[in-house]
Amino acid sequence: MKEEEFPKKIADNVTMHSSNPILYVVDNFLSNDECDAFIEAGKGRLKPSTVISPDKHIQHKSRTSENCWIQHDASEILHEVSKRFSILVQMPIRNAEQYQLVYYKEGAEYKPHFDSFDFNSEDGKKNWEPGGQRLITALAYLNNVEAGGGTGFPELGVTISPRKGDVVIFHNALLNSESSLHAEINPRSLHGGMPVIKGEKWVVNLWFRENLRY
């Protein structure tokens, strides 16, 4: 059986980059006004980004950005965007965490990591509880970056270049693991925010969980 070749267009504005894990980019999913609305909703509230440690969230040299959390209905425009994200990934918006707005200044990055949780670790179990595993990541680029700042998937040999309005969708977990009752990390979903070489980068993350969050 012939292996699938990537990237490949699956719609006029959708490019598939992998089937394991599912990874695709939707061009111009967000309008300029919608991108700007996310940034305006979070400006003035940004704090240094953290990573998960066994007991708490801590700052770490592997993640040098700033972020804040934004509610799905923080404004009418974001409420409508939330509906579209739900339709895009075919999951209820109530399964999703709040939006995470992230700002990368020149030189900032987020080294390769997993979005899903390791249930074999104490911190993984703790973060798993409110909603279950992170199944799907929606990552939207809110501005054009002058140089650098791509999203790299080292296990796939894929780098997605940031372009304002584009959304990257990828699946994080193995749903049919025979060795566990829980959806486990797909090791091929390893990814990172590459260093911003020139300019700045604004993105928003939306993580969809197994179960309802509210």
Model regions and ranges:
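Fe(II)/2-oxoglutarate oxygenase catalytic core
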Residues: 1-214
